[in-house]
Amino acid sequence: MSTQNNQSIRSSCDRCRSHKLKCTVAPENTRSGSSRCTRCIRAQVTCVFGHRSQSKRSTNVKKADLRSGTNGQETTSMQASTIVPGSPDLWVGRQEVEEGLHIGSDSGPSMADGDLWAELGTNHDLSLFDITPSSLPTHNSQQQFSATDFCSAPMAPHSALSTINSQEWQLDLSEYPNQTTTGPHAIVQLSALVAKIHETSRTLEESFWTSLAESNQLKSYPIGRVLSLSQDFSTILECIWASKNMDCKQSLSCAASDNHGQDATSSFELEDVLDYGELLSTVGTSPGRSDFSTSTHSSVATTVDMPTMLLVLSCYTSLTKLYSLVFEHFESHLSHLPHSYTSQTAHASPKWGLGLQLGELPSADETCTKVYTAVQILLDAFQSVEDVVGLPRSLSAVRQQSCGKEEEGESGDVFNRASLWTDFLAKSVFKATVKSSSEEDCEEIRQLSIKVKSLKSLIRERMKL
């Protein structure tokens, strides 16, 4: 315990420290060992010095290290913010923070001046320092602090932001219904489909179906695998177009809302930048109509990214080559079939009478019938693929056979809405695979159409249709 006459606030007695005052110990009391301050003697109360550790800094260091009022207020705010409101240490923390504050010389006499306290009488002591009970450290001090006591302790930044912006940062998952339920990405699905198509082609090329000696072996031909690949391709494309069509509509609605209210003179015209007729002539397309076979999904093709569109065209090319291989096997087998049923039906025709019924007719070659049915099923599936892909009619292996002037005239308005970007991209990709010297574009891709025509002619010839 310090025996100096002038005590600091930290080393003052409990009564003086509660009033935030420095106490002065009388010299005669120091020598006698009673250690009572002058204010407690005048007030005739017990002077109690609590267990407070004396500051290690000397009096001279304290006077030299006194801070300005602004720095003291910042220190008070920083230290008060670390104290939890309502904790028992709040009173001690505020006292220790205010120890570094001082009153300037121009604000009046010093609080530690002994003459000031000597002039004060006993009767005026308690009335002069009467304070509200809310600022006294009592056992229920947690309920007595007012809101103004914590004005120097600002709210932590993270808690303030979490309170204010807690609702703003919550995502509305209802706007994205398919984000958590969708399967693999379209690029992953298309890549796996390309691998399956190439594996099926390799299996058919290396199998015994390339050289069929008996007609019974054709019964086990795996047309189901080829049909399944076509159906899977159509399903994947439908999902791609549906998602891209939704994104395209959302982007168009956003663009329309952004451009609403703007001056019409600020928007640019397409003909000022690019001549559309000149662009059509560069890709070999007349301005009158587009070369597309269908416009169901071609208008959405411009929103599909380049890797996805290249995989789509790669799947279509691989599937086309697979169909050509299958039809080549069918044609090779039908060309070696004997004409056994022709003579039978010719000799049996005189025996047919008036009561002949349809069920009594002898059936034609069962192999030709099944091959014809298989060709029709496969072509229907492939035509569905072409419809979903939205390729030009010149690249279609099925639709270009039924292309006529009447159909073109009836659906000219539909063709005009097709996508030039898909037309140009498809021809650019397919030209890279052309090996012949023909001037016509994509001659190799049209080999499937040639196979289909040749196979149909052979079936009609064998069945005498």
Swiss-Prot record:
InterPro entries named among the record's database cross-references: Carb_Metab_Trans_Reg, Zn2-C6_fun-type_DNA-bd_sf, Zn2Cys6_DnaBD
One GO cellular component, as annotated: nucleus
Location(s) in or outside the cell: Nucleus
UniProt region (Disordered), positions on chain: 58-88
Highest taxon above the source species: Eukaryota
Molecular function in Gene Ontology: DNA binding; DNA-binding transcription factor activity, RNA polymerase II-specific; zinc ion binding
PANTHER family: GLUCOSE TRANSPORT TRANSCRIPTION REGULATOR RGT1-RELATED-RELATED
Function: Transcription activator that specifically regulates the expression of the gene cluster that mediates the biosynthesis of fusarisetin A.
Protein name: Fusarisetin A cluster transcription factor fsa5
Species assigned in the record: Fusarium sp. (strain FN080326)
